[in-house]
Design a protein with these regions (language model features):
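C-terminal His-loop and adjacent cap/lid subdomain of alpha/beta-hydrolase
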Residues: 1-140
């Protein structure tokens, strides 16, 4: 496997009877910083802060979009991608609690709904990507 990004689709192919689920925040400044800062001079040149976070998020969201598109052909793969929460600027949804992980437009209160769904073979997998962040996330 030359492209580590193909791991998601590779797992879906190798384990077609398994239910796979992926969850990240779009507004990440931790994993995206690790992934892009040293490799993109235009990001490395900007001091840490809001401007750098915006550059990181632009690349991260684009990559998430490609990743989601790659998952779409696989019925055994679900995803849960809320915008973010104001808590350590990370991609992880399970740090400390599920607070602030809801996707309002999909009527999903928090990540717990996705986890429960992932474990229920009688339900189609949730595929939720937040597109309408209407308010800041004060509970995160």
């Amino acid at each position: 496997m030359d492209n580590l990004g193909s791991l998601t689709t590779g797992l879906a192919k190798v384990f077609p009877q398994d239910r796979l689920g992926y969850a990240v925040f779009q507004a990440d400044a931790v994993f995206s910083s690790f992934s892009y800062t040293k490799f993109y001079p235009e990001i490395a040149a900007v001091p840490a802060g809001a401007k750098r976070d915006a550059l990181l998020k632009t690349k991260w969201v684009k990559e998430i979009g490609s990743w989601v598109d790659a998952m779409k052909p696989y019925a055994n793969t679900g995803y849960y991608i809320p915008y973010g929460r104001d808590f350590i600027k990370a991609h992880t949804l399970t740090t400390a609690s599920f607070a602030g992980t809801g996707i309002k437009e999909a009527n999903l209160a928090d990540l717990g709904a996705f986890v429960d769904n992932l474990q229920d073979p009688n339900q189609p997998l949730i595929r939720a990507y937040e597109t309408q962040r209407t308010t800041p996330n004060p509970s995160g």
